[in-house]
């Protein structure tokens, strides 16, 4: 799986480099990397919120169809988090290329 992630990160870096120039300073690189890291954290936080609220309802025997909808939301957020993590990796690589 690690190899596949590295391939996706390389593709993301290539795409980003076609759209945007290399970073002009450490400050710029930091800001871009911070934004991507914050977006990753936001997705993770949303998963945690869903899990916490789910636990409250699961103890009350929540309907399985409602639980499946919660799992769909968790899955969607996890996919988003994976995409953000790949962007973090790509921006780390871009930083090293830039400076």
Role assignments for model-derived ranges:
Residues 1-99:
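Flexible "arm" and connector segments at domain edges
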